[in-house]
From Swiss-Prot:
GO terms for biological process: cobalamin biosynthetic process. Keywords: Cobalamin biosynthesis, Glycosyltransferase, Transferase. The active site is at 318 (proton acceptor). Catalyzes the synthesis of alpha-ribazole-5'-phosphate from nicotinate mononucleotide (NAMN) and 5,6-dimethylbenzimidazole (DMB). This is Nicotinate-nucleotide--dimethylbenzimidazole phosphoribosyltransferase.
Length: 353
């Protein structure tokens, strides 16, 4: 708990002086004011996060965190649980969607096991921070103990901080866990106050009957566990997952170290809800990479006040949408740092300037 507390205490407000200076620079670059739209706003936000008016976000890191879920016993996913570990090995070999997109944007992929049912220790560059061999079935009792929930969040903090010596200019969240949209929907329902049906989607492709069953399982989990919406660790422990907790830790650690953090889809969004519940100020450091096709994602983004950068109908997870969004944030920072001012370029300004 000390690691978590210290991390939260380090998260300060955005650097308003840097943001004002960044806005002034944006207005003096060789373009009509506001002509680069959200790229200008992103550049200013990056300055608020980093405290630097001119900065580059070249060292990009995607944190893909994996775990299994006891609630998968209820049949809420089309895929068997062994796919979680199989996909981790696919990540390690560089053959997954996130690996391809990361190569395209020049990002490193860090893969972490915090709770799969298999032994992944010693496999290539996979990092093992295993808390347990999968969560328990939240439909019949708590997914984990409160101590395990804290351990999950702290594991995410430790994972990001372990990468700092290699350099992390910007980070993105990613997930892997068969059945993990089920706890994500439960978390979203509890922390946004929305009905289960409004925040629950088809996940890996459930039909109507499967979706109805999934909603029923979530309602049963909420009735059995009665998670306290005022206590994010209680919510995580009762209806969450180990990778969701660890992703919340990655988000908190990024903010504590003044690193822009790009949030992926629905599962990462559930982690963002937990992180904001633990430290409301962390919200200012988060950038929504995209809007997932999962219906609960739009609900939680609205609750967090985040406007997604992309809307491509994606619902893969793994950090794929965040990876693409990360390239836009890096481009925004580069524009602000490298584009010439009117004076530098010897270009006349608009007459009303």
């Amino acid at each position: 708990m000390d690691v978590l507390r210290r991390t939260i205490e380090r998260i300060g407000p955005l650097d308003q002086a840097a943001m004002r200076a960044a806005r002034e620079r944006q207005d003096d670059l060789t373009k009509p004011r506001g002509s680069l739209g959200r790229l200008e706003d992103l550049g200013v936000l990056v300055s608020g996060i980093t405290g630097q008016v001119k900065t580059r976000l070249d060292r990009k890191t995607v944190f893909v965190i994996a775990a299994d879920h006891g609630v998968a016993e209820e049949g809420t996913s089309l895929y068997p649980q062994e796919v979680t570990t199989q996909m981790m090995f696919n990540f390690e070999r560089g053959g997954a969607g996130i690996n391809v997109l990361a190569r395209q944007v020049g990002a490193r992929v860090v893969v972490v096991d915090v709770g799969t049912k298999s032994d992944t220790g010693g496999v290539g560059n996979l990092i093992s921070k295993k808390i347990a061999a999968g969560s328990k079935n939240m439909a019949v009792g708590p997914a984990m103990s409160r101590a395990e929930a804290v351990a999950a969040v702290q594991a995410g903090i430790e994972v990001l901080e372990a990468e700092l010596p290699r350099g992390v200019d910007i980070a993105a969240t990613g997930d892997m866990g068969i059945g993990n949209t089920t706890p994500s929907s439960a978390i979203c329902s509890v922390l946004t106050g929305k009905p289960v049906e409004e925040v629950t989607g088809r996940g890996t492709g459930l039909d109507d009957a499967g979706l109805a069953k999934k909603c029923a399982v979530i309602r049963r989990a909420l009735a059995v566990n009665r998670p306290d919406p005022a206590d994010p660790l209680d919510v995580l422990a009762k209806v969450g997952g180990f990778e969701i907790g660890a992703l919340a830790g990655v988000i908190l650690a990024a903010a504590a170290h003044r690193i822009p953090i790009v949030i992926d889809g629905f599962v990462s969004g559930a982690a963002a809800l937990i992180a904001v519940g633990l430290a409301p100020q962390v919200r200012d450091y988060m950038i929504a990479g995209h809007l997932s096709a999962e219906p609960g994602h739009a609900v939680l983004l609205a609750h967090l006040g985040l406007d997604p950068l992309l809307c491509l109908g994606m619902r893969l997870g793994e950090g794929t949408g965040a990876c693409l969004g990360m390239s836009l944030v890096a481009a925004a920072a580069a524009i602000q740092a490298e584009m010439a001012t009117f004076q530098d370029a010897g270009v006349s300004q608009a007459k009303n300037d």
